[in-house]
């Protein structure tokens, strides 16, 4: 089924983590097992954040060491926000899948089917390419110690014992791997499903635009009744889209806002780290790791900002699309409905962050990048 490709594999992983609501018919042992899975990943994240915090306190006077901690600390904070948000809002968020599979969002023409298929292909390609690049970045983080004669651990967190001993080193290395990979996949899953939901919302708006533009002229008296019915269907369809948009915003708003704030910390720390490296000093592999991770972080915030911006663009076309229909020959009642719909369509859809005046958009993405570079330049000047 085409619609299932928008979310299928991501929901499976959410179920593995124990953050997605089980069906009402689930047995008690399934619910207990789900709670155990959620507790396991929550404890791992909590221990990671605790060890990162201790490492930061131990090196409070050394800027570069603190920024090395921020390299992953901020990312894990956003992971914790995503995990807790999904668990706390699981009952409401389960309605997303029900809404997407609802016949109310079904296609009515071959052209609409083509629109849905194009977005499905785009979603699958983005999920796969983003997943491959993210896993590649995580693998590099784990592999880099091999090029340093195992002189350091993959993540800059507190060492619970001396890494000079092989048993202690590999025990901590294994712990770092167990911590890093599930949270990496959580990021991939959440970000790709957020993009999928926004794309599905966008294609619903495109379908509504198409239906409004196809509203035809009045040739016979009974055509006014047919047009009145189609207008009411479009108005009801728009109301369903708005309700779906509210669910999507609930999914994205909290974790996405935390992600934007954490991204600034990660981008600044990566830029500062790269500015202190030199290929001549044998830092090529470390620079490659940081560059790829930087690209993943930029991609992570770009996909949500871009898809949200597309929703805003498509919703802003609604008013023009209904005006483009052949409304001049309709009766007064239908023209009144058109006027009411145009007033409703006048405000485009925005997916806001915690700050109501700051929405997810390409402008927001540009602001994040500019802000990160400004903080980096200031930090570099202060420490030069």
From Swiss-Prot:
One of its GO terms (molecular function) is olfactory receptor activity. Residues 1-37, 87-130, 187-247, 305-348 are cytoplasmic. One of its GO terms (cellular component) is membrane. It is found in: Cell membrane. Keywords: Cell membrane, Glycoprotein, Membrane, Olfaction, Receptor, Sensory transduction, Transducer, Transmembrane, Transmembrane helix. It is a multi-pass membrane protein. Residues 59-65, 152-165, 269-283, 370-384 are extracellular. Isoform B is expressed in the antenna. The keyword Iron does not apply. The keyword Cell membrane applies. Disulfide bonds: none annotated. One of its GO terms (biological process) is detection of chemical stimulus involved in sensory perception of smell. Glycans are attached at residues 59, 370. The chain crosses the membrane at residues 38-58, 66-86, 131-151, 166-186, 248-268, 284-304, 349-369. Belongs to the insect chemoreceptor superfamily. Heteromeric odorant receptor channel (TC 1.A.69) family. Or2a subfamily. The atypical heteromeric and topological design of the odorant receptors appears to be an insect-specific solution for odor recognition, making the OR/Orco complex an attractive target for the development of highly selective insect repellents to disrupt olfactory-mediated host-seeking behaviors of insect disease vectors. Odor-evoked OR currents are independent of known G-protein-coupled second messenger pathways. Interacts with Orco. Complexes exist early in the endomembrane system in olfactory sensory neurons (OSNs), coupling these complexes to the conserved ciliary trafficking pathway. Odorant receptor which mediates acceptance or avoidance behavior, depending on its substrates. The odorant receptor repertoire encodes a large collection of odor stimuli that vary widely in identity, intensity, and duration. May form a complex with Orco to form odorant-sensing units, providing sensitive and prolonged odorant signaling and calcium permeability. This is Odorant receptor 46a, isoform B. It comes from Drosophila melanogaster. The gene is Or46a.
């Amino acid at each position: 089924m085409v619609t299932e490709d928008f979310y299928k594999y991501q929901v499976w992983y959410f179920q593995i983590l124990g953050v997605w609501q089980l069906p009402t018919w689930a047995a008690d042992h399934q619910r207990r097992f789900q709670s155990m899975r959620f507790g396991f990943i929550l404890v791992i994240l909590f221990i990671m954040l605790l060890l990162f915090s201790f490492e930061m306190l131990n090196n409070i006077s050394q800027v570069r060491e603190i920024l090395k901690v921020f390299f992953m600390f901020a990312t894990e904070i956003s992971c914790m926000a995503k995990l807790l948000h999904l668990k706390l809002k699981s009952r409401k968020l389960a309605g997303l899948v029900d809404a997407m599979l609802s016949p109310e969002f079904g296609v009515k023409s071959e052209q609409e089917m083509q629109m849905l298929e194009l977005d499905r292909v785009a979603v699958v390609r983005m999920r796969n390419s983003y997943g491959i690049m993210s896993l590649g970045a995580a693998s590099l983080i784990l592999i880099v110690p091999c090029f340093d004669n195992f002189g350091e651990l993959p993540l800059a967190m507190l060492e619970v014992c001396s890494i000079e001993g092989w048993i202690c080193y590999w025990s901590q290395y294994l712990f770092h791997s167990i911590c890093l990979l599930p949270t990496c996949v959580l990021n991939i899953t959440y970000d790709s499903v957020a993009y999928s939901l926004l794309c599905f919302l966008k294609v619903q708006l495109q379908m509504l635009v198409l239906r409004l533009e196809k509203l035809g002229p009045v040739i016979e008296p009974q055509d006014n009744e047919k047009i009145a019915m189609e207008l009411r269907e479009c108005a009801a369809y728009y109301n369903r889209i708005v309700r779906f948009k509210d669910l999507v915003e609930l999914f994205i708003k909290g974790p996405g806002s935390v992600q934007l704030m954490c991204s600034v910390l990660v981008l600044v720390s990566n830029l500062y780290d790269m500015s202190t490296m030199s290929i001549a000093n044998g830092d090529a592999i470390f620079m490659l790791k940081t560059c790829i991770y930087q690209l993943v972080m930029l991609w992570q915030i770009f996909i949500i900002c871009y898809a949200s911006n597309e929703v805003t663009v498509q919703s802003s076309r609604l008013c023009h699309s209904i005006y483009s229909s052949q409304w001049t020959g309709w009766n007064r009642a239908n023209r009144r409905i058109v006027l009411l719909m145009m007033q409703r369509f006048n405000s485009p859809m925005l997916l806001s962050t915690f700050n109501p005046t700051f929405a997810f958009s390409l402008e927001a993405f540009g602001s994040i990048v500019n802000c990160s570079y400004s903080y980096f330049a200031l930090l570099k000047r202060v420490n030069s």
